[in-house]
Design a protein with these regions (language model features):
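Non-catalytic terminal/linker segments enriched in charged/polar, low-complexity residues
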Residues: 1-138, 144-145
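NTP-binding/hydrolysis catalytic cores, primarily Walker-type P-loop NTPases
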Residues: 9-12, 21, 78, 87-91, ...
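Switch II (G3) loop of P-loop NTPases
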Residues: 154-155, 178-189, 196-214, 218-241
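Conserved lysine of the Walker
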Residues: 159
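Hydrophobic positions on the alpha1 helix immediately C-terminal to the Walker A/P-loop
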Residues: 162, 166, 193
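Conserved beta-strand/loop subsegment of P-loop NTPase cores
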Residues: 177-179, 254-261, 278-293, 297-315, ...
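Inter-motif core of Ras-like GTPase G domains
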Residues: 219-227, 240-265
C-alpha cells in the first residue's frame, strides 16, 4: 500500500493531484484544513487543504509526479509495535482471521505518519472500509443470455424463500421469462410452497426427481431467460447427498451453482460447510438471514478464505423485498457495524 499527503489551496486542486499521482483507484483517508507558515517573513500563515490518500501498489500508476509532500510508505514486514497492541487486540477479538488483522497492523506506521493527530481516527475508519472492499469480490449485475441457477446449501438456510425472491425480482423488475424447478420431493410441503409462488408470478414449475428429468425439463424450456432450481437441504456431512447433487450439476454446461450460507452460522461451522460443498463447482455465495445477527465476521472471513464472489444478500422473509444484489460498499458497511466503527 502507498499513502501520500497532498496540499493545495482548494479541494478540487488537491483531488486533481491525487488522481494524477495515484490514479482513479485511490481512496481518500482524510481531509482537513491546515495553517502553514508564510514564505515571506511577517505575513500571516496561509491556509491549505490537506488530503491524505492511499492506493494498493498493484493499482498505482507509473507516473513520477507526486503530491506536495510525498511519502511512498511502502509497507515493510515488522513486528507489531507496542502502541498497536490495543488495536490489534480489538481486531482479533472480533474473530477476524489473524492473517487479515496482522496485514492491517503492518500498515499502521505509514497511516499514522501521514494521518497523525486528530484526523487519525477518521483515516483509520476509512482505511478499514477500503481494505474490506479491496479484500472481497462481488458478482455484479446479471449479464444477458440464458442463465441456469442452482441454489444449494445445508438445511434451514432459506433456499426456497431465496429462490422465490429471485424469481419475483427478475419477473417484476426485469420482465424475464423464468421456469422454476425443484429437486426437493422429500420435504413435506416443499413443492406446494413453490407452486404457490409460481402461480402468483405466472411461471411454470417443474419437478425433477432424477438428473435425466432435469436435463429434459431444461430442453423443453430453452426459450426461457432464467431457470431457478431449488435443491434438497441436507447436512454437509451427508456424503451420499453431495454425490447425488454432483450428478444433477452435470446435465447442462450452463448450470451455475450458488451456495447459500446463513449469517447465523458460527465461523468454524461455516468453514466446514464450505469445505464439504467444495466438491461441486460454486459460482458464488448468497448470504442469508442478515437480519438475524449483528456479527458478520464469520461471513467476511469466508470471503477472505476462498476469494469466491458474493452475489446476493437476504435480510428477511418478505418476498420479493428482502433481497439485494451484493456490493462491496454494502458488505464493508455491515462489517464496520460489527466493529462498531461506523
Amino acid at each position: 500500500m502507498q499513502i501520500k499527503r497532498f496540499e493545495a489551496g482548494e479541494m478540487q486542486e488537491a483531488l486533481r493531484q491525487v488522481k494524477e499521482a495515484m490514479g482513479p483507484e485511490a481512496i481518500i483517508l482524510s481531509t482537513k484544513t491546515v495553517s502553514l507558515p508564510s514564505s515571506r517573513s511577517g505575513y500571516p500563515k496561509r491556509k491549505v487543504i490537506e488530503v491524505v490518500a492511499a492506493i494498493d501498489r498493484h493499482h498505482a500508476p507509473c507516473s513520477g509526479r507526486h503530491g506536495s509532500n510525498p511519502s511512498s510508505n511502502s509497507v515493510r514486514s515488522h513486528r507489531p509495535r507496542k502502541k498497536d497492541g490495543p488495536l490489534l487486540q480489538r481486531l482479533l477479538s472480533t474473530g477476524l482471521t489473524p492473517e487479515f488483522v496482522h496485514g492491517l497492523i503492518k500498515e499502521m506506521p505509514a497511516l499514522e505518519k501521514e494521518c497523525g493527530g486528530s484526523s487519525f481516527s477518521e483515516a483509520l475508519k476509512n482505511f478499514l472500509h477500503w481494505k474490506v472492499m479491496e479484500s472481497l469480490d462481488v458478482m455484479g449485475p446479471v449479464t444477458e443470455g440464458m442463465k441456469i441457477w442452482v441454489l444449494i446449501g445445508p438445511t434451514g438456510v432459506g433456499k426456497t424463500t431465496t429462490l422465490a425472491k429471485l424469481a419475483a425480482q427478475f419477473r417484476l423488475k426485469a420482465q424475464k421469462k423464468i421456469t422454476l424447478i425443484t429437486l426437493d420431493t422429500y420435504r413435506i410441503g416443499a413443492v406446494d410452497q413453490l407452486r404457490t409462488y409460481a402461480d402468483i408470478l405466472d411461471m411454470p414449475l417443474e419437478i425433477a426427481s432424477r438428473p435425466d428429468d432435469l436435463k429434459k425439463v431444461i430442453e423443453r424450456h430453452m426459450d426461457q431467460d432464467l431457470f431457478l432450481i431449488d435443491t434438497v437441504g441436507r447436512s454437509p456431512n451427508d456424503s451420499k447427498h453431495l454425490e447425488d447433487l454432483k450428478e444433477y450439476l452435470t446435465v447442462h454446461p450452463q448450470l451455475e451453482t450458488h451456495l447459500l450460507l446463513s449469517a447465523t452460522t458460527k465461523d468454524r461451522d461455516l468453514a466446514h460447510t464450505v469445505e464439504r460443498f467444495s466438491c461441486v463447482p460454486v459460482k458464488s455465495y448468497i448470504f442469508t438471514k442478515l437480519d438475524e445477527t449483528e456479527d458478520y465476521t464469520p461471513l467476511f472471513n469466508q470471503l477472505l478464505r476462498t476469494r469466491k464472489p458474493l452475489s446476493y444478500l437476504t435480510n428477511g422473509q418478505k418476498v420479493p423485498e428482502d433481497i439485494e444484489l451484493a456490493s462491496k460498499e454494502k458488505v464493508a458497511n455491515l462489517f464496520l457495524n460489527t466493529l462498531h466503527w461506523n
